[in-house]
Amino acid sequence: MARIISSLLFAISFLTGQWGVDESRHTAITRAIESVEPAVASISVVQLRDVYNSFSRGRDPFFDFFFPERSRKKEVRSSGSGVVISPDGYVMTNFHVIENATEVMVTLPGGEEYEAEIIGTDFITDLALLKLRGRNFPYATLGDSDDLIIGEWAIALGNPFGLFDISKQPTATAGIISAMDMDFGFQSGKIYKDMIQTDAAINRGNSGGPLVNSLGEVIGINTFIYTASQFAEGSIGIGFAIPINLAKDIAEELKVSGKVDRSFSTGLSVERLTEEVAEYLDVPIRQGVIVVEVEKSSNAQKAGVKVGDIITDVNGQKIRSSREILKIIKESDLRSGNKIKLKIYRDGKTLTKYLILASVK
């Protein structure tokens, strides 16, 4: 009897231990992947690209003068990633994934394929919104990219090197949030600001896919990586994602109007402050713009800006012309409703005014 009881206890202990091992394999990471994986998409695109004659490269400038290289449009196939963000089939991705596309096909885990409609694109933030025909799609929960901690888990899912098309499932890599609020300024017409940096491996084809936290919430859209050289394509653990809070705002605007409206009004007319004008006005300021008109009932008037004020700084940057003001606003991707900080010289004093950009009616 004692031997039987001992054997039973051993069996129970073994089974309990085995269950414990199996249970330990299910972590926050695996659960996060399981929750978001059904909503991760492979995006296959046919794009029109300029293709140059191969023999025209690396030639003597003499021949280039008489026989300039010629290009032609050619359909090229490429792939990227995306994430379904609603049960009615809206898909978020990068603009550069579907740029110049003549055909966009979306494949979901399991192999279901859909022709996607491009609802809208935004070149400046490098985001695009697609729509699948149908309903009751699996979709990802969107998190809050303003509530992140450096060092917390970050999981990248997507279609690196077209592997999704082979396995009919996304590839997942895990790392941490390495840094936040990374600003790269104006890059080839695009603005990459407040980017999330991660060491989760991101490779070619991951663009447009989700960066996920350990709760299974999308916190960013994977966009680009740093590589060892311009010829290397593999990840070295330095990848960047567009914060999901920005992506959500852009997607909502694309859903409504198909584009992002960046028109605005300052309610001001200004002229460059020249050396001659500064001497005539007898002011010590030699750099800035002078306000020559303030529109009645405008936000500028409400902010307390007056004719004759000399604006020297906008958002902490020195300015010398109205063009530089517009450049600062554009490169910060500011729109109507956003606030700009003005440093003003008036009657021997330096003042600070906050002007809300108005919409253009």
Model-predicted segments: where are they?
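Residue-level recognition of beta-strand microenvironments
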Residues: I43-V46, P87, I119-T121, S145, ...
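Conserved active-site neighborhood of the chymotrypsin/trypsin-like protease fold
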Residues: Q18-H26, R77-S79, V84-D165, K248, ...
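Glycine-biased strand-turn-strand hairpin within the trypsin-fold
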Residues: Q18-V91, E99-A101, E112, S188, ...
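Short flexible coil/turn linkers enriched for glycine and charged/polar residues
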Residues: G110-E112, T121-T125, G134, L148, ...
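Active-site loop architecture of trypsin-fold serine endopeptidases
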Residues: D22, V51-N53, A101-E103, F137, ...
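Gly/Ser-enriched beta-turn/beta-hairpin loop segments
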Residues: F67-E75, I119-T125, D165-Q169, M180-I196, ...
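Hydrophobic beta-strand signal
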Residues: S42, S86, M92, M105, ...
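C-terminal recognition in membrane/secretory proteostasis and scaffolding
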Residues: A2-D22, T30-R31, S81, F95, ...
